[in-house]
Structures are given as structure tokens and as C-alpha cells.
Swiss-Prot record:
An example Gene Ontology biological process: terpenoid biosynthetic process
InterPro entries: GHMP_kinase_C_dom, GHMP_kinase_C_sf, GHMP_kinase_N_dom, IspE, Ribosomal_Su5_D2-typ_SF, Ribsml_uS5_D2-typ_fold_subgr
PANTHER family: 4-DIPHOSPHOCYTIDYL-2-C-METHYL-D-ERYTHRITOL KINASE, CHLOROPLASTIC
Enzyme type, top EC level: transferase
Functional note: Catalyzes the phosphorylation of the position 2 hydroxy group of 4-diphosphocytidyl-2C-methyl-D-erythritol.
Protein name: 4-diphosphocytidyl-2-C-methyl-D-erythritol kinase
Gene behind the chain: ispE
SUPFAM superfamilies: GHMP Kinase, C-terminal domain, Ribosomal protein S5 domain 2-like
Pfam families (alphabetical): GHMP_kinases_C (PF08544), GHMP_kinases_N (PF00288)
Alphabetic keyword roster: ATP-binding, Isoprene biosynthesis, Kinase, Nucleotide-binding, Transferase
Molecular function (Gene Ontology), one example: ATP binding
Pathway assigned in UniProt: Isoprenoid biosynthesis; isopentenyl diphosphate biosynthesis via DXP pathway; isopentenyl diphosphate from 1-deoxy-D-xylulose 5-phosphate: step 3/6
Active-site residue numbers: 16, 141
């Protein structure tokens, strides 16, 4: 990351994995009640922010099918500007690396990186807790990225408690299909009554064993998504001969954990021609964590 008085460049918006994802019921507001553990990755989009003196908020990068006003980075900047009353503006550029509709939290992470970066660039000095509350308006996963640590999450994903996770390398494979989260949540076949657990349950069973992630929990969305999207089912079957694997979020990405980078790279080398995969490592802390107190 490169910082000047008027810009912040090369700001990583890290991807996330859901190490498990249980749907435990419905909340009074109609949203689904979830339990999950979020794992940060050292892989993601890269954002660049340049202060504007005219107060305008602009996006200097074209993204297919995402108009600027709908972009979560622009929405985050406008939300922060409105919340604080600052007269500052910003131009945002995005090097998009994460696939959309993949369950990796790309848009949500971009939004959180925007809030953290502008808290610094605009010299707002808002506390992290205030940014987290504000970020709920942008999406259920955004508060986690503002929180900035690997976390056990409940509610819609905004109730967060830090967890210490062992270092790992991952192979993440993303089939060429976009899975709309809202549509999966609407499926009648979706499990919505998984028994709630405690963070102690997770920590007691979670390990670096060869059986992980099969050794703890599941992704309640995986069976439904694999049934609707043959591409996801195909990736899961491919992993059967490589390592235990699981879908992250509502898909479409599927991941497996490895104890070393060499093991992950060796698995990546076996990918069928035309498949998209990335070898990445775990992160303990968001790269912009220090930008909020």
C-alpha cells in the first residue's frame, strides 16, 4: 500500500471463505439467521483512492454490468460522506481480480476497504464500531471486513467474535457460473433449521487434520446450489480425488485447505484445461486494520 497526502494506492480488498455456513432459522425481519466462520485470504481486488477537492465521488474504472452508482465502493463513499458531512470527494479505481457471484465477498470487501481507506484519507478518525454499524447498510458481509479479523459470526453475519485460526494455504476453484444469493435463499429445499452451536464447539473440533473441512459442520447451501448448477457439482466431484472440499458462501467457488503452498500448487496443476483456480494463503488481519481504532 502506498500512501500520500492525497491518495492511497494498492489497497487490498481481501477475499473471504466461509469455513462452514449453517442456517439456523429466520429472524423477525425475514432475514435468515446464520452461523459461520469467516477466513480472510491474501487474495482480492486492489483499490486506489485519490482525493478530489470538488467533493465529487467518482469511479475511474469501467466494470461490466456494474454501473458506477450501483458499485458498492461508490455507495460506501457516498454513505460515509453523508454520515459525516465531510466536503471531501474521491476518485476510486478498482483492479478487479475476484469473480463476482462466487461467494468470496468481493463486492462487500471492496466496500469495507473503501470505508477504511476514506476514514484515513479524509481524516475522519471514526472508530471501528461506528464504521461497522454504518456498513450493515451496504450488505451482510461488509461488517466482517470492517471488523478486520477472522471471526465467528451470527445473526445475518454482523455479530462477530474474533477467532484464532491456524495458517493454511487454499486452492479456490471458481466455475464459470454466477450464483445469485437471493435466489438460493428462496429455494424451498434449503435447510433452515440447523441446530445452533457455540464458538467453543467450533474451536474444539476445528483442526489442521487431513479430514478438514469434512471434520466440522457443512455449508447448508451447498446441496441446493450443486443441484441447480451442474458446474458447481462438477468441481465438487473433481475435488473428491484431490482433497476434502466445500463451497464458500452461496457459491459458486469451492475450496480445499492444504498445510503447505507446495501441496496447494500441486493440486492446482491438476486442474482440467479451462478451469479457473487460485492458490492463496490465510490472513489473520485485514491490511487496512490500522485505519480505524
Amino acid at each position: 500500500m502506498i500512501e500520500t497526502n492525497d491518495s492511497l494506492r494498492d489497497c487490498l480488498a481481501p477475499a473471504k471463505l466461509n469455513l462452514f455456513l449453517h442456517i439456523t432459522g429466520r429472524l423477525p425481519n425475514g432475514y435468515h439467521a446464520l452461523q459461520t466462520v469467516f477466513q480472510l485470504l491474501d487474495w482480492g481486488d486492489t483499490l486506489h483512492f485519490t482525493r478530489r477537492d470538488d467533493g465529487a465521488i467518482t469511479r475511474g474504472t469501467d466494470i461490466v454490468d456494474v454501473p458506477a452508482d450501483a458499485d458498492l465502493t461508490v455507495r460506501a463513499a457516498k454513505l460515509l460522506k453523508e454520515h459525516t458531512g465531510t466536503r471531501e470527494g474521491v476518485n476510486i479505481e478498482i483492479d478487479k481480480r475476484l469473480p463476482m457471484g462466487a461467494g468470496l465477498g468481493g463486492g462487500s470487501s471492496d466496500a469495507a476497504t473503501t470505508l477504511l481507506a476514506l476514514n484515513r484519507l479524509w481524516k475522519l478518525n471514526l472508530p471501528r464500531a461506528e464504521l461497522q454499524v454504518l456498513s450493515v447498510k451496504l450488505g451482510a458481509d461488509v461488517p466482517f471486513f470492517v471488523f478486520g479479523k477472522n471471526a465467528f459470526a451470527e445473526g445475518i453475519g454482523e455479530e462477530l467474535e474474533q477467532v484464532q485460526l491456524p495458517p493454511r494455504h487454499f486452492l479456490v476453484v471458481t466455475p464459470r457460473v454466477h450464483v445469485p444469493t437471493s435466489a438460493i435463499f428462496s429455494e424451498k429445499e434449503l435447510t433452515r433449521d440447523t441446530k445452533p452451536l457455540t464458538i467453543a464447539d467450533f474451536l474444539a473440533q476445528h483442526s489442521c487434520s487431513a479430514e478438514w473441512p469434512d471434520s466440522f459442520g457443512r455449508n447448508d447451501m451447498q446441496q441446493v446450489v450443486a443441484g441447480k448448477y451442474a458446474e458447481v457439482a462438477q468441481v465438487l466431484r473433481w475435488f473428491d480425488n484431490i482433497a476434502p472440499a466445500r463451497m464458500t458462501g452461496s457459491g459458486a467457488s469451492v475450496f480445499a485447505a492444504f498445510r503447505s503452498k507446495d501441496e496447494a500448487v500441486a493440486a492446482h496443476a491438476k486442474l482440467p484445461v479451462g478451469w479457473s483456480g487460485a492458490v492463496t494463503a490465510s490472513l489473520d488481519t485485514h491490511p487496512l486494520f490500522a485505519f480505524a481504532a
